[in-house]
Regions:
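N-terminal nucleophile
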Residues: 1-172
C-alpha cells in the first residue's frame, strides 16, 4: 500500500508539475500510513514526497511528519518498541505540545487515534482544541517536572585556576 501511495503521489507531481510551478506552488506531501492486514503484524510507514518510504521497526518504533525538531527529543528519550500503547499516546501529546511551545505556527486542534493490534477497528480517538483542560494540565505538569529535574541536576564541576596566567583556549 505504501508503494501504491508513493507511486500515485509521484504521478500527480509529474502530471501537474507545469501548473504547480506556474502558480509557484511547492508541492511537498509526506504521509503516515499505518494499519494491519488480518493475520499480519500492524505496520507503520512514512511516505516521502518523491514516493519513497520507510517502515517503522523495533529500532525505530515511531515516525513523525511536520515540524519535528522540537518534539522529537522527548520521543527519542522515552519511546521504545515495548513502550505500552497508552504511554506512547501520552508521549506523542507531550511531543506535540513541546512543538507548540517552541513554534507559534503549530497549534491545536490535535487529533490522535490509537489502534490496538488485532482489533481491526479504531476504538480510541481524541481531539484536543485550544484551551482543552487535559492539554493545559499536561503542559503545566510537564513544565513543573522538567523544572524539578533541571533543579535536581548536579552542579558543574568546574576546573579552577588560581593563578592569573593567561592561556588562550581558543583555536585559530
Amino acid at each position: 500500500i505504501a508503494y501504491y501511495i508513493g507511486t500515485k503521489s509521484r504521478q500527480i507531481q509529474e502530471r501537474d508539475r507545469t501548473w504547480l510551478e506556474k502558480d509557484n506552488v511547492d508541492f511537498h506531501c509526506n504521509f503516515l500510513l499505518g494499519g494491519q492486514v488480518k493475520g499480519e503484524e500492524p505496520q507503520l510507514y512514512l511516505i516521502y514526497t518523491p514516493g519513497n518510504f520507510i517502515k517503522a521497526t523495533q529500532e525505530t518504533p515511531f515516525m513523525q511528519i511536520g515540524e519535528a525538531k522540537y518534539g522529537k527529543p522527548i520521543l527519542d528519550r522515552t519511546i521504545t518498541y515495548n513502550t505500552p500503547l497508552e504511554a506512547m499516546a501520552k508521549c506523542a501529546l507531550l511531543s506535540i505540545d513541546s512543538t507548540m511551545k517552541s513554534n507559534i505556527s503549530v497549534g491545536p486542534p490535535i487529533n490522535l487515534v490509537m489502534y490496538e493490534t488485532d482489533s481491526y477497528t479504531i476504538r480510541h480517538t481524541l481531539e484536543l482544541r485550544l484551551g482543552d483542560p487535559y492539554l493545559a494540565k499536561m503542559r503545566k505538569l510537564w513544565e513543573e517536572y522538567v523544572q524539578q529535574a533541571f533543579e535536581a541536576m548536579p552542579n558543574i564541576e568546574w576546573k579552577y585556576k588560581d593563578d592569573n596566567t593567561e592561556e588562550n583556549i581558543f583555536i585559530d
